[in-house]
């Protein structure tokens, strides 16, 4: 449902915040006293942000549905249709003009040329996400995980019944 979709977006936001905090906590001071956050953590965010952004757009499209297609222009509120628009678009949570602004923003982000350019920016400005992920893997410190697997396999071999 709606809450599940919005919950995925808020969970993605918390993952981003947590990763940024980790990058700050695992950073270091260089010889000039300049603090640099952990690049490995930041690369993890960079590799997932385009997908998170795309998902946010899809959720917005789904929730706004047909409302974004027929949204009036702001000038129409000054014309003969103002009363009808106010009655039709006002909800218990937003005035007609506020709802129109929100729906116009949703349309701009999900369906206009501006929104599509922003999507391309999210995917490629920071670098090719596939390349970033490959570099992230190549730079990952997997030693602790590999040692844990080795211990589990050794324990399994010791307990194997043949």
Regions found by a protein language model. Name each.
Residues 3-8, 36-43:
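Short, charged, amphipathic alpha-helical segments
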Residues 40-161:
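Alpha-helix capping/hinge segments and adjacent helical runs
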